Amino acid sequence: MSKTLYQKIYDSHIVYEDKNSEAILYIDLHLLHEVTSPQAFNALRNKKRKVRQSKKTFATMDHNVSTKIRSIHASGSMAQKQMEQLINNCTEFNIPLYDINNPNQGIVHVIAPEKGMTLPGMTIVCGDSHTSTHGAFGTLAFGIGTSEVEHVLATQTLKQKRFKNMKVEIIGEMPKFVTAKDIILFIIGKLGSSSGAGHVIEFCGNVIKNMSMEERMTICNMAVEMGAKSGLIAPDEITYKYLKDKIYSPFGIFWEKSLDYWKFLKSDKNAYFDKCVTVDISNLAPQITWGTNPDQVISIDEKIPDYNNINSIVKRKSAKSACEYMGLQSNTYLTNISIDKVFIGSCTNARIEDLRSASKILKNKKVAKHVTAIVVPGSGLVKNQAEEEGLDKIFIDAGFEWRLPGCSMCLGMNKDRLNFGERCASHSNRNFEGRQGRGGRTH
């Protein structure tokens, strides 16, 4: 029987399956951070349980950390408490931790791939919705809730139903100045923020084949913004080259054996997909969101749509509400709208390739005097590499603040946030109301 990539990975991780209930899947890697793990550890203690596979568990601090100084005391009392709890929990249960003083510390979805922890064919979970990022490696990766975090810590398994299969084929030639972020935003805008609900999406096509791993991670990172459980891309030579000689990658004879298995990880020719979509990006222009949902997006040269012309009552109300919150009017160009802040960072776009691209545009240019702009590398490794290449100097000369690694302004859980009514051009993945701070407006 022909199978999709998702079905192959799912089936190979079944510990137990009953026709009357969901399957129990083995989890190869469990990623932790300071925000969604404290309650799970407390539950373990209350039930007198231990962590079943501490060596298949990895933790870092990212959501709450200060990007100005290396101190757990710099982001408020709640953040400090969560980071202290993570340190204590990892010490007690013998879990590897990149804490605030570790030179490798950074965003969990940046660290795991760059260290070779993320490998094709694995199952990976984390108490964070953008765990789908790891799907770029042909990995079944998805976010889980705190009660599920507890379950994985205790059993290294997770009860999980079978999701439907969706294929998004991306074809054409990538236009100049168009990035992976533009492509996935365009797809979300075209198909809708619930188009992937109940599905795992496999991205394929010549555009995907020509993408770097950094670009593929951006695509899979935002699969959840289509409502999908996760995103997947079949591994290939680009994947293998990226993983070769990483710290946690297989080596020697184990590398060769892994390659043999990884080459099997692709959808069979006649595999059935419940939904198939083909998207041609040959004429695509850079994309930017105007509203409070990722599917409220337009090309940079388009006007904000007139919500009065939207047929769907629900979408019309949503568009009107978004315009009111964002302080925008229909039929205007976003290029004429003034911004207050710029954020380059997040698990979507804070890797070395992203910083290189941004620095090329900024070289010999200056940030407007009224704009506050920050760059937050995704990890210590990315930061060090950028500094070796002199990218930090380009950003600083342009008027940007060069910060320490962390989630930063992607979400309002630390001191990097928007003030009420401020408008930000952001590299992050969500433009929800208040996402970057109460009353903040995100593009």
UniProtKB/Swiss-Prot annotation:
What reaction does this catalyse?
(2R,3S)-3-isopropylmalate = (2S)-2-isopropylmalate
Annotated S-S bridges? none
Q: Which PROSITE patterns match?
A: ACONITASE_1 (PS00450), ACONITASE_2 (PS01244)
At the top level, the lineage of the source is Bacteria
Q: Which cofactor does it need?
A: [4Fe-4S] cluster
Family per record:
Belongs to the aconitase/IPM isomerase family. LeuC type 1 subfamily.
Q: What is this protein called?
A: 3-isopropylmalate dehydratase large subunit
